[in-house]
Amino acid sequence: MKVKSVIRLIENDGWYFVRQKGSYKIYKHPIKPGIVVVPDHGGSKDLSLGTENSILKQAGLK
């Protein structure tokens, strides 16, 4: 799955962009605890399966 697709998924779930440090975008949710860190090394690149699963778990989508 591409970085842009993952970002679209978590934003549709209510997560919002807080800040960026280097190539890493950090998102928060108004209700769910914690943060989600999305590596953005070029939005058109595919994420590895493990990274994708980790992001979705952080967001509570998996």
Regions of interest found by a model, annotated:
Residues K2-R19, I26-K62:
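Basic nucleic-acid-binding interfaces
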